Amino acid sequence: MSLVCRKFNGYNDRPWLVWLHGLLGCGDEWLPLVNLCAQHPSLVIDLPGHGDSTDVRVKDLLEMSCLLSETLAEQRISQYWLIGYSLGGRIAMHHACYGDIRGLCGLLIEGGNPGLFSQQERNNRLEHDRNWAGRFRSQPIEQVLSDWYQQPVFSDLLPEQRQQLIKVRRHNNGDGVANMLENTSLGHQPWLVPVLQQLTLPFVYLCGENDKKFQHLAKRCALPLQTIPRVGHNAHRANAVAFAAVVNHFLSLFNKEYEYDLPERRRTLFPNCMAGLL
């Protein structure tokens, strides 16, 4: 089994950019970024329960990581960067910490939560996500989306932006979204911070300037934060040009070493490059 995906810019011989969307999204939402990052080949993936992978279901994040590896193997992708937003960012971080990372060049995470520290926090989140999942299964999706985008993390959205998101997301399958929300809930996710801090892979944590919650989270967890100006939680959608500029700059720090295949150099180069970026 593998996920539905599409390849772009495959004539390039650099490592692939593998784009993982958030809950309620689909692979195609990354296309503006794919076009702006055309010096790398790109693979956009529809996650389980979403887009053309609506009928795919995973039981947890570990199975999701295995499915990601199977998809990459089927596409014959041997070297790749993971770029993930929100749920996609959590999947990417979990994969880097606990999955098969052969060929993984690095992580670019946008607003992904690295986990909840206490069991009580995880239990509360499980209840929260089960409630939303129940609504996605049983209520008209436009009604649920209208409430979903009233959550504090989306407070920077203008009314017209909120309505546009509802219009785009209303084609989702409620059961598919609900299954993914429950089975990959933040309440099931391990506390990834200690493992993330030990990674030798290049890693940057991207966050909108107006997304105070995730900026605070990144600083509290000592993640390598880089802010995108004048945008909130969904930075890549709000300002694709600025987001792509940061992505391209970060990748440019490592392009030559992959051309010359020097993995040992990457391990020593990364801290200095990150200091220059931030």
From Swiss-Prot:
Q: What GO molecular function annotation could you give as one example from this UniProt entry?
A: 2-succinyl-6-hydroxy-2,4-cyclohexadiene-1-carboxylate synthase activity
Q: Keywords on this record?
A: Lyase, Menaquinone biosynthesis
Identification of the protein by name? 2-succinyl-6-hydroxy-2,4-cyclohexadiene-1-carboxylate synthase
What is stated as this protein's family in its record?
Belongs to the AB hydrolase superfamily. MenH family.
Asked if the record carries the keyword Lyase, the reply is yes
UniProt record, GO biological process: menaquinone biosynthetic process
Please give the coiled-coil regions recorded for this protein: none
The species is: Photorhabdus laumondii subsp. laumondii (strain DSM 15139 / CIP 105565 / TT01)
* Gene for this chain: menH
Name the domain of life: Bacteria
Top EC group: lyase
Tell me the route in metabolism or biology where this protein functions.
Quinol/quinone metabolism; 1,4-dihydroxy-2-naphthoate biosynthesis; 1,4-dihydroxy-2-naphthoate from chorismate: step 3/7; Quinol/quinone metabolism; menaquinone biosynthesis
- Function of the protein: Catalyzes a proton abstraction reaction that results in 2,5-elimination of pyruvate from 2-succinyl-5-enolpyruvyl-6-hydroxy-3-cyclohexene-1-carboxylate (SEPHCHC) and the formation of 2-succinyl-6-hydroxy-2,4-cyclohexadiene-1-carboxylate (SHCHC).
Any one Pfam family match given in the protein's UniProt record, by short name: Abhydrolase_6
In the Enzyme Commission scheme, what number(s) does this protein have? 4.2.99.20
The reactions it catalyses are: 5-enolpyruvoyl-6-hydroxy-2-succinyl-cyclohex-3-ene-1-carboxylate = (1R,6R)-6-hydroxy-2-succinyl-cyclohexa-2,4-diene-1-carboxylate + pyruvate
SUPFAM superfamilies in the cross-refs:
alpha/beta-Hydrolases
According to the record's subunit comment, the protein's assembly and interactions are: Monomer.
